[in-house]
Amino acid sequence: MELSPLQPVNENMQMNKKKNEDAKKRLSIERIYQKKTQLEHILLRPDTYIGSVELVTQQMWVYDEDVGINYREVTFVPGLYKIFDEILVNAADNKQRDPKMSCIRVTIDPENNLISIWNNGKGIPVVEHKVEKMYVPALIFGQLLTSSNYDDDEKKVTGGRNGYGAKLCNIFSTRFTVETASKEYKKMFKQTWMDNMGRAGDMELKPFNGEDYTCITFQPDLSKFKMQSLDKDIVALMVRRAYDIAGSTKDVKVFLNGNKLPVKGFRSYVDMYLKDKLDETGNALKVVHEQVNPRWEVCLTMSEKGFQQISFVNSIATSKGGRHVDYVADQIVSKLVDVVKKKNKGGVAVKAHQVKNHMWIFVNALIENPTFDSQTKENMTLQAKSFGSTCQLSEKFIKAAIGCGIVESILNWVKFKAQIQLNKKCSAVKHNRIKGIPKLDDANDAGSRNSTECTLILTEGDSAKTLAVSGLGVVGRDKYGVFPLRGKILNVREASHKQIMENAEINNIIKIVGLQYKKNYEDEDSLKTLRYGKIMIMTDQDQDGSHIKGLLINFIHHNWPSLLRHRFLEEFITPIVKVSKNKQELAFYSLPEFEEWKSSTPNHKKWKVKYYKGLGTSTSKEAKEYFADMKRHRIQFKYSGPEDDAAISLAFSKKQVDDRKEWLTHFMEDRRQRKLLGLPEDYLYGQTTTYLTYNDFINKELILFSNSDNERSIPSMVDGLKPGQRKVLFTCFKRNDKREVKVAQLAGSVAEMSSYHHGEMSLMMTIINLAQNFVGSNNLNLLQPIGQFGTRLHGGKDSASPRYIFTMLSPLTRLLFPPKDDHTLKFLYDDNQRVEPEWYIPIIPMVLINGAEGIGTGWSCKIPNFDIREVVNNIRRLLDGEEPLPMLPSYKNFKGTIEELASNQYVINGEVAILNSTTIEISELPIRTWTQTYKEQVLEPMLNGTEKTPPLITDYREYHTDTTVKFVIKMTEEKLAEAERVGLHKVFKLQTSLTCNSMVLFDHVGCLKKYDTVLDILKDFFELRLKYYGLRKEWLLGMLGAESAKLNNQARFILEKIDGKIIIENKPKKELIKVLIQRGYDSDPVKAWKEAQQKVPDEEENEESDNENSDSVAESGPTFNYLLDMPLWYLTKEKKDELCKQRNEKEQELNTLKNKSPSDLWKEDLAVFIEELEVVEAKEKQDEQVGLPGKGGKAKGKKAQMSEVLPSPHGKRVIPQVTMEMKAEAEKKIRKKIKSENVEGTPTENGLELGSLKQRIEKKQKKEPGAMTKKQTTLAFKPIKKGKKRNPWSDSESDMSSNESNVDVPPREKDPRRAATKAKFTMDLDSDEDFSGSDGKDEDEDFFPLDTTPPKTKIPQKNTKKALKPQKSAMSGDPESDEKDSVPASPGPPAADLPADTEQLKPSSKQTVAVKKTATKSQSSTSTAGTKKRAVPKGSKSDSALNAHGPEKPVPAKAKNSRKRKQSSSDDSDSDFEKVVSKVAASKKSKGENQDFRVDLDETMVPRAKSGRAKKPIKYLEESDDDDLF
């Protein structure tokens, strides 16, 4: 059966031929407006259906036999490419219909113009269509507008969509054959169409029993495409499509011309594109691959040619991409943008599309019923919500994407763009005159043809510029210009683009010299483009001056390394010491050289010495002398090779932190060895020095700055002080003020007496910080804060001006630093003046009491505060030969808890309680979370809401004092219930973390040492301190022996004179001395002993007199002035008896001392210190209670005042929780730290290998099976003095003078505060400001420990026995004890430290006794060796504060290190709570007061029955947010 639907087309063509003949004849309406059939329309307007049928030339991905898949220019006909693709996609679609399909065979025969595509799998049904009355294969391949894809309710993931595909191929072929077999219908169908589907051949039907298959064979009508044959380009495109199908269709083998294509999946297919492609560094591109789910597969790599994509939708190659590509790319871009912004802080702003331009993405997707913008299906337009699936890329993929080179590529592009901006804005060209830099004194020849002979002198500040200008009077202004620097310039190696662009100093130097970014100054001609041929650096001869030189060298080396090879840089040195005698004068340019001269000059004391601390010390006359001898003072920097580059990079590159550590470690060790061997220090500037290599400068001069930076920033293990703090202490000891002194005046005194060379403002802040005592500052303030020294409201920033506040030494300070030890210390000398010692030697390690924090070069230090009494007790244990007990961080007057998560990992918890279903009360904030900051950054956003989060609370009220915290917060019931579920501590940000993995301190020999645990610090200190007690005893024995001998001689002399055995009247002096020697009298014993010690007792004797003749040499021979100078009234009976008594007492004192060991001396000092500590604490408490309710006064008003300030007794305390996740995170941090240290090869400090850290951790875990918890509270009679945290940021260690809460608080359920949780002492100096926005710089002066004492409670008379000494939990012998007990026990003191009578106390019979072992982190704070045992107080304030449910009475301990502790039980806790709530509801509302916030303490002053919980309490957990400061 033959049809001829093309007849009208042929007639139309004939009509067109006659057109010329009928040109003049008017066209009829019928010939103008014509109707065509669908088939006619397709042939007449093929571009509507298959794209252009004209040859086009464009860049395409093709497959060439010799190179594989490549991107090249091809000439092809899009229409022909499309009809081939339609058949190929149909074959691939069959995989979605029949998952068992496994093979596609493609045959392309250009010679015979024949293309065949065969696939197995379910075939086309060989059955007659009952409606159309023809077989289905004939229907769908030979009839237009037929398809199986018209049911849009059916979700399909196939390429076919509109019903045109295969028919279009038929129409544009001269011959088109369909062959399909159906196992289901047991038939094989075959039919051929000819002449552009114009004629249909006979249909063949045969019986069939094999597997289904379909084969389409066609011969394209090349004439329609204006082609003669299938050329190389179109075949290359078709072959690539065969590879596409092999890569995008899973589990299908594709054969091309009988050969199987070597593609094993999408990942393998992607590699074909990336073969031989390299990144910017010459390495193969990294590919990130993920099979997200069965419908999505993504690969990503870096692109150097803008955004590139290869994508498939249901096997269709979407060469123009579409929304499926955007959907995936946008996810990746959003993540990469965040990373780039973090790494490019301050650089050129990077936008999303710029990040996308560096990506090459491969996407293979199956999408339900996709839509396209044309029949060519190059761009997929379906919206993402209709994809039928999602593609959520995993964190693993994103992490790999960040590391695959894209981020580096973007950052390189950013640098390139930044460079363009720098060149545009910051580079300079050569001009004769420079405008806009007023402080520049330009050389007259700068910018002229003689510019290479000009030198620019860069000076340290305006005063140095004045010196240089004075000197220019000698050398002239033609060749020398001067420009003053304002302090230290930027480290450009680590600076951001924005910093460099905005740095006026850098830009001025570039402009003055005429430098251009990225220009190479290798040859001499390039130097002629500069306005100056050299830069001369003129700074002070101190370490800060060396740093400025180093920064300038770094600036030139980083941007123009070639300039260093031309000797472009030089320095101008000035003397640091001058000595003169008569008219002779010598200058020294380094202190070691001066010391050498002194040691080789016997009469050096006769020379006048003048020290030059800066350029400003030199006079104009001296400046002219310097410039007149330019050869001596000008030192050129000489480039000696790659070692110079390496040295500069070592000093200033951020990436070489570990190398710098090793560099400084070697320096400190070398310096130590030189001291031990008595060798002089190495120095650079000798009399003959004319040049210097950069390597020498870095390793011999700049390293002194880096070391001094550490010395200024990191305290000593011995006294816990930094040099500035030590100078303050030295001055206070020397002044020994009995009256208070203004801080500003004391600062001036310190600068004078201790030779302090920096600004007095920083000195005043150091003094203030040493005196601060608020919660979170010092546990023991060494100075007294007399005036406003700052509070916890603002973290100390609210201190008054130093002109208005006073201070003086704390009465405890000289007990900590006994004067008897001063003689054993090594004092330093500055400008020939004796100043502070290299360290003091306190009786307890102050670095643990007040903590430490600082950031130096290569190292940083972070140590929390610890409890004073715990430290004292541990020292006593060491003195007794016992092992010290573990300690948790502790902050004076802090009422919250600190818990240990892992070794050196802690979490700090504030206090929150629930008052009723809509009200909570916050009564403590984590350490260093200041009240005002918390209000502004946490509560205000919760009250007002933000753009992203709705309001959480409805109102809050504040009842703080300067020492206490109290927020009463209102919420809806629903919000409060939800907050309880999440955890109130977490919601209200009342947990912060503390990491102590950087306990780095200077040891006693001046070397940095890293400590793994706090007990390592304690043991190091103990060994050294014990040795110095031995030295003290030795010194005292000598001194007492000399004094005893002196008194003995004096008494004997007086007695013999009275008896007439010695006659001194009217005798020559020489004869008298002879008589005394004959009678066996000693020459002055005290003077002789002091001379033997080679130490001069008084500072004044160390100071040289300006008068050269004052060096009087002591008379040779014995001296008896101590006898002969005695007054006559010594001969009286009274004075004689007194002298004999003194002699006997001194002998007794000497004998007593001989019988004491160094340990005895130490224990005595500790006993005296603890006794005075209790006096001071009692006074602090008394001072704080001034104005609070007492015995007199109006009780009601006072109670009302208390109710506002103190925590409500009704509150149900929320127990902070530590989740397993928090512990796991802490362990992960430790593992990560150890791993990073091992990988980076950080040098071990002082022989402590990193492996030992792990061993210590394991050892500690065995030793402390349970997690340790410490509830910080202070007992009323003898508070456990919480180790006051030293302001780690400041130069001073502030001491918390107030050790206890100043007010008594009625008990409430919350008050098992002390025992409520097994709080582990955890605090993270890294993340003290999880939410607070205080910036790190200000924190330098403001880090202080928080108040560690809970509110005191008023207790009825019957409970007023003196409380037990602060009890801390004993070491647990049960590793699982933490998990077993729902109610944490309060820490108790070790059995050994308890007074005998307290150990016999038994628990109340009405209370359930639940024995629990807890890790002993705290030790008895009051009953200590060497102090008098005190009676056990009954229910003191502290007792109630710590245990509102009843005094916790310790069960007698079985072992020293394991103490069983009674667990509180509370059968009625819930009912009690209900009663309390009802009381609140019933209480009368005061005038003008919102009842919601009213808690009347009048009704609740009597404590409720004290009991623990019977039920397991609700636990409120907060995860720690960990931000590392360092």
UniProtKB/Swiss-Prot annotation:
Cystine bridges: none
Site (Interaction with DNA): 488, 491, 660-661, 722, 756, 762, 930
Primary residence: cytoplasm
Modification type Phosphoserine: residues: 4, 1105, 1208, 1290, 1292, 1294, 1297, 1327, 1332, 1369, 1372, 1382, 1386, 1464, 1466, 1469, 1471, 1520
Binding site for ATP: 90, 119, 147-149, 160-167, 375-377
Cofactor dependence: Mg(2+); Mn(2+); Ca(2+)
Region (Disordered): 1-21, 1089-1117, 1180-1217, 1233-1526
Record InterPro entries: DNA_Topoisomerase_II, DTHCT, HATPase_C_sf, Ribosomal_Su5_D2-typ_SF, Ribsml_uS5_D2-typ_fold_subgr, Topo_IIA, Topo_IIA-like_dom_sf, Topo_IIA_A/C_ab
A Pfam family of this chain: DNA_topoisoIV
Textual note on the cofactor: Binds two Mg(2+) per subunit. The magnesium ions form salt bridges with both the protein and the DNA. Can also accept other divalent metal cations, such as Mn(2+) or Ca(2+).
Reaction catalyzed: ATP-dependent breakage, passage and rejoining of double-stranded DNA
Modified residues (N-acetylmethionine): 1
Additional remarks: Eukaryotic topoisomerase I and II can relax both negative and positive supercoils, whereas prokaryotic enzymes relax only negative supercoils.
Function: Key decatenating enzyme that alters DNA topology by binding to two double-stranded DNA molecules, generating a double-stranded break in one of the strands, passing the intact strand through the broken strand, and religating the broken strand. May play a role in regulating the period length of BMAL1 transcriptional oscillation.
Assembly, per entry: Homodimer. Interacts with COPS5. Interacts with RECQL5; this stimulates DNA decatenation. Interacts with SETMAR; stimulates the topoisomerase activity. Interacts with DHX9; this interaction occurs in a E2 enzyme UBE2I- and RNA-dependent manner, negatively regulates DHX9-mediated double-stranded DNA and RNA duplex helicase activity and stimulates TOP2A-mediated supercoiled DNA relaxation activity. Interacts with HNRNPU (via C-terminus); this interaction protects the topoisomerase TOP2A from degradation and positively regulates the relaxation of supercoiled DNA in a RNA-dependent manner.
Name of the molecule in the record: DNA topoisomerase 2-alpha
Lineage summary: Eukaryota, Metazoa, Chordata, Craniata, Vertebrata
Gene name per UniProt: TOP2A
